[in-house]
A protein has these predicted regions:
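Short helix-to-turn junction characteristic of helix-turn-helix DNA-binding domains
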Residues: 54, 229-232, 280-281
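An amphipathic alpha-helical interaction segment
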Residues: 127-153, 157-228
């Protein structure tokens, strides 16, 4: 399994489509990651990725705090906001924006989890968009998610695989909006595949001089090293052995790895092991000793010390604190009224 797939598996993506919209110029909407809206569609999550697939027409988008981030999108292009940050999207981004909660206020009858359909704007040229988001566990500063641009677009019609995803998502969104059985489940899986394709396209488009995790994945030698570290995280790796596996000298691999990722291979491996440990602790099915053994620690005490260095508290306390946060998130899921999706009144 390649490093991209391995990291995507670790963050446990869970996708959803919440809106199919028909917008007519002039129009502008400010999108926020609303906790109540997310709770109606997604499981509890550490991070939410927002995306918008342009089905027809065109629009502009930019981060709310960065006018220089404005990009133009045409039909067939996908807008991704990996950090779920507040962003503007519209026929122009210098218009007074309508908040998402105002736009969705008319969706009072929609049950939580169902795809909403809205029409909005001034009656000019039409733009149709499918809007969704993905929840993902981001216990550690996940190398993939933290390497992506704050806002970027991907042309979904550049190859047959991406074009198939785009057409499938359009069809599934229309089915779900018509309340066809199973439509939302299909949309969830397509959303996840859409994000994977967006990540791969982002890697392919990197300039030659780029550094960071994505550039490391693309590099012939560092990418192979990352795949080995991810696939066999429990193995007692040394830089010498890793270098032999990828076909470089020890010094050449160490330098190349550090230049691209900003840290040496063994430091990266230690952090990746803590990512695996955090995922196991969140799952709650294994003892601390079992988790320690799974990631290659010979003693629970050594594991606890390493975990504290990474997360600022021992693993038992960290798991307990995360359990409390998750319980609060699940309670919030019962009251999605802030987004305009209100629960039914008591009978």
């Amino acid at each position: 399994m390649d490093a991209v797939s391995d990291v995507l598996r670790a963050v446990r993506l869970s996708g959803a489509v919440y809106l199919t919209g028909t917008f007519t110029a002039p129009w502008c909407v400010i999108g926020r990651t609303d906790a109540a809206l997310c709770a109606a569609y997604l499981p509890r999550s550490e991070r939410v990725v927002s995306y918008h697939l342009i089905i027809e027409g065109s629009c502009w988008a930019q981060l709310a705090d960065d006018p220089d981030s404005a990009i133009h999108l045409n039909a067939g292009e996908l807008l991704v906001v990996p950090q779920g940050e507040t962003h503007l999207i519209g026929s122009a981004v210098d218009l007074a924006p309508t908040p998402t909660e105002v736009l969705l206020a008319g969706q009072m009858a929609v049950e939580p989890g169902e795809v909403m359909t809205v029409s909005y704007g001034g009656g000019g040229p039409t733009t149709r968009i499918v809007c969704g988001f993905l929840a993902c566990d981001d216990t550690l500063s996940n190398p993939l998610l933290s390497s992506l641009p704050r806002l970027f677009k991907v042309d979904m019609r550049h190859d047959p695989r991406a074009a198939w995803l785009e057409s499938s998502l359009k069809f599934a969104a229309s089915e779900a909006a018509s309340s066809r059985a199973g439509g939302t489940i299909v949309l969830a899986r397509l959303s996840e595949l859409l994000f994977v394709e967006a990540v791969r396209s982002c890697i392919e488009a990197l300039p030659d001089h780029q550094t960071g995790w994505l550039a490391g994945v693309r590099d012939r030698y560092v990418g192979r090293a990352l795949s080995l570290l991810h696939a066999q995280a429990v193995h007692p790796w040394t830089v010498d052995e890793l270098a032999r596996k990828v076909g470089l000298s020890r010094s050449a691999l160490a330098q190349r790895f550090t230049d691209l990722l900003g840290q040496p291979p063994m430091q990266y491996l230690a952090r990746w092991r803590m990512q695996i440990a955090a995922q196991e602790l969140l799952a709650g099915r294994k003892s601390l000793a079992a988790v320690a053994e799974q990631i290659g620690y010979e003693s629970e005490a050594a594991f606890s010390r390493a975990f504290r260095r990474e997360f600022g508290m021992p693993p038992a306390g960290w798991r307990k604190s995360k359990g409390k946060m998750n319980g609060a998130a699940e309670s919030a899921q019962a009251v999605p009224a802030a987004s305009g999706i209100t629960p039914p009144a008591d009978q």
